[in-house]
Regions:
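NAD(P)H-binding glycine-rich loop region in Rossmannoid oxidoreductase-like domains
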Residues: 45-91, 95, 99-102, 119
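Conserved Rossmann-fold NAD(P)-dependent oxidoreductase catalytic core, especially the SDR/UDP-sugar
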Residues: 94-138
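Active-site Tyr-X1-5-Lys
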Residues: 134-162
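Glycine-rich Rossmann NAD(P)(H)-binding loop
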Residues: 171, 193-198, 226-233, 244-248, ...
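N-terminal Rossmann NAD(P)H-binding glycine-rich loop of SDR-like oxidoreductase domains
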Residues: 3-23
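Mid/C-terminal beta-alpha module of Rossmann-like enzyme folds, strongest
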Residues: 214, 218-272, 305-308, 318-322
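Substrate-positioning beta->alpha
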Residues: 95, 145, 174-180, 194-217, ...
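Conserved C-terminal active-site "lid" loop/helix of NAD(P)H-dependent oxidoreductases
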Residues: 205, 238, 264-295, 306
Length: 322
């Protein structure tokens, strides 16, 4: 089997390429810049909307995993964020899908986002695949539009489409907010998060690529949407404590009423960030379990341990070399 992976040099892409190679798959990697990759072949495509860029990379491919995207940012400085997200996440995705269908690709696996469902849930009322979508920012809107257009292409061309909506992904090499959290824990910064009673679904990158691999080949995955997580939800407090344990340090957490945290965040212009940190977001992965027979192969504890150990090791190396 020959699989094309866009975003092959990214955080998830590197893990996926490694897994597929272990499974004996021929992997064609694609990225916007030419880099060294574990893929059997790697192509640089600076503009994914270029209709002439895909003939060679798609040649002979049985399936395609589309990871590349314009990712969500907390404070987008562009004049028209939705237009920029649509350019990459909708228009370029559809160009790729049409080229893939013309090239004879049988299945297109699209990595979307749980943000298509919405930003928060009530405890014990997780998101499901058949819930009404509720995208609330430009990134989520663009992902939802891409999903709908891909399903239309599937009907028109016969190319199968699989959509996966992950929540926050962590793992070795993770950056952004998760890395900031690990940094705060490692260096013993006091955090007012000692009694946050929320529940959130997270996703270890190893579990995500496991589901992607399953969706590439399972007959029942065709033209389906799947939500995915580690299968065990934790509070923000529990997450920080687990990271501290894996780092070999004690979490310096103290309790502050959530209302006070929210009021302070509003004054500092951090309301949205705190809502995401302290709010609930749970997903139900029953469909992937029941339809595909898939189970997350890696526990939350083991996933966090691998993530933190890599983070601590990288920081130690930086300190040695500085």
């Amino acid at each position: 089997m020959k699989i094309l992976v866009t975003g092959a040099s990214g955080f998830v892409g590197q893990h996926l390429v490694k897994l597929l190679k272990q499974q004996g798959v021929c992997v064609v990697g694609v990225g916007r810049k030419l880099i060294t990759s574990d893929a059997d072949m790697f192509f640089s495509v600076p503009d994914f909307a270029d209709i002439n860029a895909w003939q060679k990379p798609l040649e002979g491919c049985d399936a395609l995993v589309h990871l590349a995207a314009r990712v969500h940012v907390m404070q987008d400085k562009t004049v028209n964020p939705l237009a920029e997200f649509r350019k990459v996440n909708v228009d370029a995705t559809l160009n790729l899908a049409k080229n893939a269908a013309q090239a004879g690709v049988k299945r297109f696996v699209f990595i979307s986002s749980i943000k298509v469902n919405g930003e928060r849930t009530e405890i014990a009322k997780p998101f499901t695949e058949d819930a009404v979508v509720n995208p609330q920012d430009a990134y989520a809107v663009s992902k939802n539009e891409a999903e709908q257009c891909l399903l239309q292409i599937a009907q028109q061309t016969g190319m199968e489409v699989v959509i996966i909506r992950p929540p926050l992904i962590y793992g070795a090499g993770v950056k952004a907010n998760f890395a900031s959290m690990m940094r705060a824990v490692k260096y013993g910064l006091p955090l007012p998060l000692g009694n946050i009673q929320n529940k959130r679904s997270f996703l270890y990158v190893g579990n995500l690529v496991s589901l992607i691999a399953k969706c590439i080949e399972h007959p029942k995955a065709a033209n389906q949407v799947f939500l995915v997580s580690d299968g065990y939800d934790v509070s923000t407090t529990e997450l920080l404590q687990a990271c501290a344990k894996a780092s070999g340090v004690k979490a310096r957490l103290f309790s502050v009423p959530l209302k006070l945290i929210e009021m302070t965040a509003a004054i500092l212009g951090k309301r949205v960030a705190v809502q995401r940190l302290c709010g609930n977001l749970q997903v139900d992965i029953s469909k992937a379990r029941n339809l595909l027979g898939w189970e997350p192969p890696i526990s939350v504890e083991d996933g966090l341990k691998a993530t933190v150990l890599r983070f601590v090791g990288d920081k130690d190396l930086q300190e040695i070399n500085s």
